[in-house]
Amino acid sequence: EYGQFGGEPYGALVGDYHFDHSPPDVELLGEMSKVAAASHAPFITGANPTLFQMDSWSELANPRDLTKIFQTPEYASWRSLRESEDSRYLGLAMPRFLGRYPYGDKTDPVEEFAFEEDTEGADSGKYCWVNAAYGMARNITRSFKEYGWCTRIRGVESGGTVDNLPTHNFPTDDGGVDMKCPTEIAISDRREAELAKNGMMPLIHRKNSDMAAFIGAQSLQKPAEYDDPDATANANLAARLPYLFATCRFAHYLKCIVRDKVGSFKERQDMQDWLQNWINNYVDFNADTSPEEVKARQPLAAAEVQVEEVEGNPGYYSSKFFLRPHYQLEGLSVSLRLVSKLPSQKAG
């Protein structure tokens, strides 16, 4: 569709798979990243707990440091994949979330016959789990439907929630009632930051509720570090999916626009002015005061277009687009200073 005249490009690719660091999976992810990069459509899929040397996500709280797991020799090909240029088009979501209530008279009755689905015991495999990639896909499509852009896909207040999850209550051994975590395991803030640092997109359950959220939307790519702080900052932005989705959408439009202009009598300056005026429609020039809804529809804080002639090839031009998106809050360091007045000893 992307390379077809009149075609409608795909915005994203979603795969119902779970990948780990095995050689076949790394090779397949590498090839999929090339397809996603060529079509400017990020590939969203799931991560397998075996990627972290675990049998299930319920063991996620056990390792003290997740980063050390990826420093062993068996992860050499995985590290190479994360350092590749096209890996920014890969997104691995985890853990799984509950797809439905267990069948039963009090949870989800079956009209045709009496059936009680057995979910007793500690075996979480008795439940119906869904790939977390579908949760991210839901946020992507919702953002596109409401704003025309796939930028509001993360955070509790900015489109990252997955609502109305099944909340199955079960009796405990001590006679109480507990709720099955709808995301396999509750993930702490510290562990969420570790997972994001290692290229994962964790789905975090809000305790005692039927809601979970993607706090971050980090791609699989490991951002490169440079001596120049600005270059390092650009690498960090390029590895985050909200900014990548905005850039990909511009790439889709540009190919169609330039294709329609082939054969028209345009000088270099005319083409540059026309493209600059077009892209200014998506720049929020009042970013300091505009609400979040305006930023979602106009995802750029600044944009500049440069068109240059190709030497030795009349009628051909090369263009450069400099895009600066609205920055999203990634974290906040808090310092506290406590002041206490102590009673002084009175002179006798």
What do the PLM-derived regions correspond to, one by one?
Residues 270-290, 294-296:
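Short, hydrophobic/π-rich interface segment
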